[in-house]
Amino acid sequence: MSSKGPSYRIENIVATVNLGVELDLEQLAERLTMAEYNPDQFPGLILRLTKPRISALIFRTGKMVCTGAKNEEDLKNAVRALVKLLKDHGADVPFDPEVQIQNIVASGNLHAEVDLEQAVLMLENAMYEPEQFPGLIYRMSSPRVVILIFGSGKIVCTGAKSEKDVATAVQKLYNQLKELGVLYVEEGGEELEEFEEEL
């Protein structure tokens, strides 16, 4: 039973950064030409980096939310670049602030069709209501993620706190579905038999 196995790609990492100091956003907005700051509409200052392509929401309290990173290395580089930018423009921020990943979103492909009707009966913490949403919602307990599974084999994984969590969750899901006999992998143009038929 050879198959391509699962693949995935990280689409977005959301992280919070605690700079540990209060910031003068008005002053920063004046000094940083690329900053967007309109306190009547939004209380934070918005900075967009191009390399890596990341957006940062910076708040007066010294908290920062970074979105758009595709991997943890890009996130680290972006935080370093943002800290340098803030320091260069008068903010007294630490060089190595506390960074915490809040959510990683990844899209993937199991490279096999999934029998969602059967999968929902066999997986714990799964919900499938096709008249409301075409995917099965699976809450995996370890790692703690939520995976949307579609009949085509496409998946979306959310809630991971590290790249390792994503890799573990995707492989674990694939193995579980394979063991349950609800994956249909095309091999030589023919669909593999259902697990029940192999018994």
Curated annotation (Swiss-Prot):
Pfam families: TBP (PF00352). Keywords: DNA-binding, Repeat, Transcription, Transcription regulation. Disulfide bonds: none annotated. One of its GO terms (biological process) is DNA-templated transcription initiation. Sequence repeats lie at residues 10-86, 101-177. PROSITE patterns: TFIID. GO terms for molecular function: DNA binding; DNA-binding transcription factor activity; general transcription initiation factor activity. Signal peptide: none annotated. General factor that plays a role in the activation of archaeal genes transcribed by RNA polymerase. Binds specifically to the TATA box promoter element which lies close to the position of transcription initiation. PANTHER family: TATA-BOX BINDING PROTEIN. Belongs to the TBP family. This is TATA-box-binding protein. It comes from Pyrobaculum aerophilum (strain ATCC 51768 / DSM 7523 / JCM 9630 / CIP 104966 / NBRC 100827 / IM2).
